[in-house]
Amino acid sequence: MRKIISMLFAVTIVFGYISNASAKTLKCQTVLNPKADEVVMLKDFTDTVTTLTGGSLKFEIMPAGTVVGGKETLDAVDKGLIDCGFAWTHYWSGDHPAAMLFGSPVAGGGVGIDNLAFLSWFQYGGGKELYDRLWDEMGRDIKGFMLQPVGPE
């Protein structure tokens, strides 16, 4: 069963396939507090998904620490303890140095790659394939999706 995770340089969401066909609510733990702007935008996104699916797919968004600690979110999705996770990929740069490429792209102060160039590279220039390879090299059965690109800080 393939787990799907979304944790990119920005912030993204993670999904896991549900083995129970009658399940309609995905439990998604973030690495943030519930009032963070990113969580507000995540809830807007999941509300849109719920609307587009006619209510057949819903999300329970849980703050960091609800099921596992923030740093354990990736493992929890991989092991099926939660259905979704929401974080920045660079949280796992200690597990693989390439995670920083997706969590903190080279840019800033007019030097390097901006958000538009990063999104273009990710979608059409081989970035998505490298992102998949990152999780494979980390031994995770997951797949990433980008939801909220944020630029360099």
How would you describe each model-predicted region?
Residues 6-11:
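Sec-dependent N-terminal signal peptides
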Residues 14-23:
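Sec/Tat signal peptide C-region and signal peptidase I cleavage site
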Residues 27-43, 64-68:
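Extracytoplasmic "Venus flytrap"
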Residues 60-62, 145:
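General small-molecule cofactor/ligand-binding pocket signal
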